[in-house]
Amino acid sequence: MRRLGIGYRLLVMGYGLVVMVGCTQQPQPVRRLSEKQEVDSALMAQMAFNMQMASAADQACSNWVKNDSATYVLDEFGFWYSKTVNLYADSLQAGDAVGMHLQMAELNGQMLADIEDIFTVGSGDLPVAINRSLKQMGRGEQMRIVAPWYTAYGTEGTQLIKPYTNIVITLTINKE
């Protein structure tokens, strides 16, 4: 009978030990999501919700524009505008301080705000739809803006305007 070498016997014993240990291991507990993964999934859910809300807002604003008698232009940022008083005045520039009258209403006509104040063009104090519209206006001109919530007061809203509110803005620039 042939004797196996010590190396072969150790190899066989080691293999048996590995097999035995492998069979007796306890199942690992299911790994809980990390805090970062939980935040990421909450963020993804919020983004999906906002995308649905934006799509509904686009449809609502588009329908409102179709039912109005004025001719509107769709801005690349997603809001509609129509110059209702066009004096062909020089366009306002970033940094210009202008007196203006803002009337804001929901798409159903419910008045939300009626504000007369002095604002600085491009200061970031105003929503995107208003800031971009100001750059296309001159003194004494008027524009109607139909703004979905994401170009108006967004997910935060204000004291007067609830979050996710689509609004119609009548914007009049004072002559002086």
Summary of predicted features, one role per range:
Residues 1-23:
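Sec-dependent bacterial lipoprotein signal peptides
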Residues 23-176:
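Cross-family detector of peptidyl-prolyl cis-trans isomerase
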